[in-house]
Amino acid sequence: APTRRRGRAKENCEHLRIMSPTGDTAVLTPDRWKTENADSGTDRRADVEAKQRRIAALLQEAGCEGLLVVEPENFAWLTSGGAARGVPDASELPALYFTADQRWVIASNVDAQRLFDEELNGLGFQLKEWPWHWGREQLVADLCHNRKMISDRPFNSHKVVADQLRGLRRLLTPYEQACFQVLGPLVSHALEATCRTMNAEITEREVAAQLSHRLLHRGAQPICIEVAADGRSRRYRQCGYTSLPVRRYCVMTLTARKYGLYATSSRAVCFGAPDPAFKKEHDAACKISATYIASTWPDAMPRQILAAGQHTYRLTGFEHEWRLCPQGHITGRLPVEMNLLPSTEQLFQANWGITWHASVGAAFSTDTFLISEEGPRLVTPPEAWPLKRIKVQGAEFFRPDLLLR
């Protein structure tokens, strides 16, 4: 079995209840939120400077003068949470240019002022601005002319280092972990408050609207919303939402973005006594997710963890259900940084974000965690929610149960 450090798993199960730091703010950018001790590695400017040093090392290794960054996920990573909101044309998105000791934002005259006022103030970036009628490519070509460059996507003769950047950004820094622990409870709150207050007979679409409102009200952005009424998710595991009314029960899964990071969670509510078939599916999904969580340690191999999950699927009487939906993925600056497949052998690393998504019939058991040396730390903790106690090889885990109304 892939479970590590069995003797320590029970004591570290408290990490499944970690709550967010205080001091959250209802803005999308993290520069106005800091923990009390800015010297602990959670200060945003210090985080950007640390990434500058990583880029300097990458440039030295590649023997190049500069790095061009165009992909939005890398923009968010290297600015520690910056975002180009309100830019519908991907070719007009801002870019970044790094040398070993300096950094620039490449932006249009339409967006430059807002970026520096609301996203990047005080972070040490300089500006290279293009008139909106020029387009980004002309300025980038001029800036990189006769320079030996690396970039995160193919451009002229640049060496592409997308894989190297992906590996670097998956390792969440202390600042990013602090931001992660603010985002997660916002996702949990949106799901649980909606389950507690929604009425029967409202449509899946109205449920999705409530989830969106609760996120946006607190400065988080809904990315993916799935609402399944009365077993619709048995037919469609990635179900979106429709005009179907909720009569007996509802399962909802929510992915949100804040500080350029992503977290996902699910909850389910029943009106009246739960449908016996659905309750059996939900109980099985909770056991399977607990199996995954118990093995979420640094150096664990996804292939082995998924094999253990398949064994639990068989034990619960749902042998083939794992084939119908992805079971988990690494998350961070993209909603899905890497899907976990039965063939995946890349070992987990400490400070990766991970989402486990067990699905059985109409039921989902989904949450996001931080992989740490002390065990899996729950990023999307329940607030005031019924919990199901599950033992895995002697260790106890708590999974969100059905809310009965």
Each PLM stretch: what is its role?
Residues 10-405:
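Active-site neighborhoods and metal-handling regions in enzymes and metal-associated proteins
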